[in-house]
Amino acid sequence: MLRCSMADAPVTTRTFEHEGRQLVYDEYGAGPRTFVLIHGLLLSRRMHAPLATALADRGHRVVVPDLLGHGESERPRDMWRYSMPIFGEEVLGLLDHLELDEAVVGGTSLGANVSLETAVREPGRIRGLVIEMPVLDNALLGCALAFSPLLVWLTFGEPLARLVAAGARLAPRGLSHLADMGLDWISQDPGPSAAVLQGLFFGRVAPPRAERAAIEAPALVIGHPRDPIHPFSDSDMLVRELANGTLLEADSILELRMRPERLTGEIGDFLDQCWRPARRGAARTRRAAG
């Protein structure tokens, strides 16, 4: 699959195969400075389109995938196919597909935790990390309260959820980026979405503290107040654990979506720093495919 658009930065949509499953990704911009940007839970790569476009305009190549079970990638109904470590392997598989020795990797919420999984698996391939809204130790109660009812709805209410999804697919898009994200979220097939939640519930949420503390790559950690699922205390804790972490406080969960200029500038500056010559050691060796 190959689709191109010329709105702002050129965007190319491609696919690759990982462990026998087809995954979709968008590519914004071009060049050697690659940033892999990962979406949130049950969202799609389109959530990061504005940020990816802005960073591509600054000279970065931004690659935005749909993880398995999300967006336009394959969406099997088997819960065992989904876990944070598996998602981390998918990102490494994408680097292999792109023939990249190293990249900056980052994401939001689920994408933040997947980025950490990628970093602990192959630290030599991580030029830097952009971690927005990590879900760690202090988020346990908030996640249980938010996602347990959602899992029940998607599992036992699947017939009704399918009707709601069908109605959402008929709704017009284009009113706003946030509205389109919400409609995309509601219009998903509930079966695979339930499998994603089940798989994540039965696995680890993030690498354990000792593994996080071993990450040496520079990391920009973005947190915000008043969010029980992504408590600011988790972002603060992560920065204290990491060897080279920097904390950036957002005004709210919506700042990067509705008033993105400040945070986009900070992220762009961080990416520029990550790619300064001779700031890391010798060239890395790409992992063998398969």
What are these regions (language model features)?
Residues 21-74:
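Conserved HGGG/HGGXW glycine-rich cap/lid loop of the alpha/beta-hydrolase fold
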Residues 57, 64-106:
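Active-site loop/oxyanion-hole signature of alpha/beta-hydrolase fold enzymes
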Residues 107-111, 115:
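Gly/Ala-rich beta-loop-alpha elbow adjacent to hydrolase catalytic centers
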Residues 116, 120-121, 127-156:
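Flexible "cap/lid" loop of the alpha/beta hydrolase fold
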Residues 181-210:
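Hydrophobic, aromatic-rich cap/lid helix
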Residues 215, 221-223:
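Short beta-strand/loop motif that positions the catalytic acidic residue
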Residues 228-234:
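Conserved alpha/beta-hydrolase "acid-adjacent" motif
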Residues 244-290:
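Catalytic active-site module of serine/aspartate enzymes centered on a nucleophile-bearing elbow/loop
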